[in-house]
């Protein structure tokens, strides 16, 4: 049987000094025989998705101790992408994922912890912790802070979110009073933003990977039911420790749970629910940490056969995460996929022997368990608050309509091809990504004229100054992992195109990425990026570009000979923006850029450079 890792610092005469320090943290003689379970919390007062997590670590800790473990909590950083959006703060968002992954590794390995409970929530925190968990490969359970309630206002007949506030603010026809009303109403409670944005997408995907509990991605942050997820996570962490260290059961290790089958399940779910394109970036990065052979070609293959079963804001205004929960949450989507023969039901989870067992227990259309039905009736209270577990409102009924409800069956899918697609062509030889769930069908094939911007800042200025016209394809380049550096999100350009009435009249292509709040014909992750010699750096103003989503292609309408000539000229100039940018790049960001790969590799560090 494997020894507890913690014995390295808790056993033997030569560890007297280490034990003295452990005792100073509160440990007693009997504790040195127990597993030490790290709690990686991400509480911060900067981020609404994390502002309520201050006491969650100790809630989990008490449960761990009650069931025979020793709990030790530490914190990671957490960047709010919405607050960092639209200025140089966004340069730090994606790099923070690597910092979070490294910090979890540092803390867990430095102190020889035996297992981890990861308390995450927002955009880069869940991916960073996921990368660390798969890198460390010791027992782990994920539990997130949960989504916020959708906003409400008398000025709109649908739920509101952050993107609504941004769009009205950029719309010159909207009064200051309307903008203020949306601003005050869009984000009413603690929790991750209420739509199927990156944070909620990733928290849902941890359910499909088998590393978190049913309801993790959809139970509201404010609802009393969420407390049970934290408590159960603590109990399961102790159980997993016992199964691995006492029974030698390696099946509980994260690399065995998050197998290739699990990654295919997660991506299948992502496509079916129209998740954020950022999830592709993060799943590719996580797969590399798990040493799973899973790449953009695999995602492309899945995108061609998986239907879209769920549409949530920003892809449709009618539904938010609270509505997904009412319809049965993630295990109801997984159940529909399983019945369509699109899921590996033999994949394991940290809470059930197999995905099939979990679906049988948690899919509301399959189980008659009243407790499960009651759980998924948890709904919003409509009371602004930053307090977790502060309300216990329940819907009077579940959404069981699989023909026209929030979650559809395969037979009644929103579309027979899913909500994400990978495009290839001479402008993106290694691929680029589009969230088709947010693209109007009328522009699935679009030919337009390139309008070049060498930064997000110049693109925003150009859009607001009416330099972009109907029929243009906005090209924003040198915003990739190396070129930015940091691969900024382009939520402001896409939101401003919508506010200018160009949401269905223009496209946008970038080697940067998009917020989960983005909709429209917005194509990101162009690989290789411009700074790495990608063809997006060769496009000129006035070039024609043909986008063909059904055929998964994106083509610059320029001859191979002309592209070769342009490449020779660009090599002479160097792969950098044509116009200087007023952008200060810190030493920390330069260090990130030095090792960063393009988006098709997950924007992870280039290990070949480290190994070489």
UniProtKB/Swiss-Prot annotation:
Subunit annotation: Homodimer.
Database matches in NCBIfam families: ilvD, PRK12448.1
InterPro entries: Dihydro-acid_dehy_C, DihydroxyA_deHydtase, DiOHA_6PGluconate_deHydtase_CS, ILV_EDD_C, ILV_EDD_N, IlvD/EDD_N
Any one Gene Ontology cellular component term annotated for this protein: cytosol
Signal peptide segment: none
Recorded metabolic or biological pathway in which this protein acts: Amino-acid biosynthesis; L-isoleucine biosynthesis; L-isoleucine from 2-oxobutanoate: step 3/4; Amino-acid biosynthesis; L-valine biosynthesis; L-valine from pyruvate: step 3/4
Active site: 515
Molecular functions per Gene Ontology: 2 iron, 2 sulfur cluster binding; dihydroxy-acid dehydratase activity; magnesium ion binding
SUPFAM superfamilies in the cross-refs: IlvD/EDD N-terminal domain-like (SSF143975), LeuD/IlvD-like (SSF52016)
Enzyme's top EC category: lyase
Chain residues that bind [2Fe-2S] cluster: 122, 193
Residues modified as N6-carboxylysine: 124
EC number(s) recorded for this UniProt protein: 4.2.1.9
Binding site for Mg(2+): 81, 123-124, 489
PANTHER family (alphabetical): D-XYLONATE DEHYDRATASE, D-XYLONATE DEHYDRATASE YAGF-RELATED
Reactions catalysed according to its record: (2R)-2,3-dihydroxy-3-methylbutanoate = 3-methyl-2-oxobutanoate + H2O; (2R,3R)-2,3-dihydroxy-3-methylpentanoate = (S)-3-methyl-2-oxopentanoate + H2O
UniProt GO BP: isoleucine biosynthetic process; L-valine biosynthetic process
Function in brief: Functions in the biosynthesis of branched-chain amino acids. Catalyzes the dehydration of (2R,3R)-2,3-dihydroxy-3-methylpentanoate (2,3-dihydroxy-3-methylvalerate) into 2-oxo-3-methylpentanoate (2-oxo-3-methylvalerate) and of (2R)-2,3-dihydroxy-3-methylbutanoate (2,3-dihydroxyisovalerate) into 2-oxo-3-methylbutanoate (2-oxoisovalerate), the penultimate precursor to L-isoleucine and L-valine, respectively.
Cell cycle in keyword set: no
Family statement: Belongs to the IlvD/Edd family.
The protein's name in its UniProt record: Dihydroxy-acid dehydratase
Keywords noted in UniProt: 2Fe-2S, Amino-acid biosynthesis, Branched-chain amino acid biosynthesis, Iron, Iron-sulfur, Lyase, Magnesium, Metal-binding
Pfam families cross-referenced by the UniProt entry: ILV_EDD_C, ILVD_EDD_N
Annotated cofactor note: Binds 1 [2Fe-2S] cluster per subunit. This cluster acts as a Lewis acid cofactor.
